[in-house]
Amino acid sequence: MIREECLLKVLRAPHVSEKASTAMEKSNTIVLKVAKDATKAEIKAAVQKLFEVEVEVVNTLVVKGKVKRHGQRIGRRSDWKKAYVTLKEGQNLDFVGGAE
């Protein structure tokens, strides 16, 4: 069992984009920014514990940081990890519920 303190450090923020919104509507998948060293098992446990939903599968990828310029200086943003968390049939989690 993974300790609860570690679970709180795994999930960083929801990733809000057009692709993430489409994934939520079509395949009941939420997209999250997670800690770079987080495993699929830790992500699954954190989502189930914090949001009280059943997770079917977790897919992860590392997004490479962009090269940015500020004048003549060239820098690079940090890499970060993205997780696609597919919820089981009948489960629902709404991060971006609009004001009505």
Curated annotation (Swiss-Prot):
GO CC terms in record: ribonucleoprotein complex; ribosome
Pfam families assigned to the protein according to its UniProt record, in alphabetical order: Ribosomal_L23
GO MF assignments: rRNA binding; structural constituent of ribosome
Keywords from the named record: Ribonucleoprotein, Ribosomal protein, RNA-binding, rRNA-binding
InterPro entries linked to this entry: Nucleotide-bd_a/b_plait_sf (IPR012677), Ribosomal_uL23-like (IPR013025), Ribosomal_uL23/eL15/eS24_sf (IPR012678), Ribosomal_uL23_CS (IPR001014)
Cytoplasm listed as a keyword: no
GO biological process, one term: translation
Function text: One of the early assembly proteins it binds 23S rRNA. One of the proteins that surrounds the polypeptide exit tunnel on the outside of the ribosome. Forms the main docking site for trigger factor binding to the ribosome.
Subunit structure: Part of the 50S ribosomal subunit. Contacts protein L29, and trigger factor when it is bound to the ribosome.
Record family assignment: Belongs to the universal ribosomal protein uL23 family.
PANTHER family in the cross-refs: 60S RIBOSOMAL PROTEIN L23A
Name of the protein this chain belongs to: Large ribosomal subunit protein uL23
Source species: Shigella dysenteriae serotype 1 (strain Sd197)
Phylogenetic lineage: Bacteria, Pseudomonadati, Pseudomonadota, Gammaproteobacteria, Enterobacterales
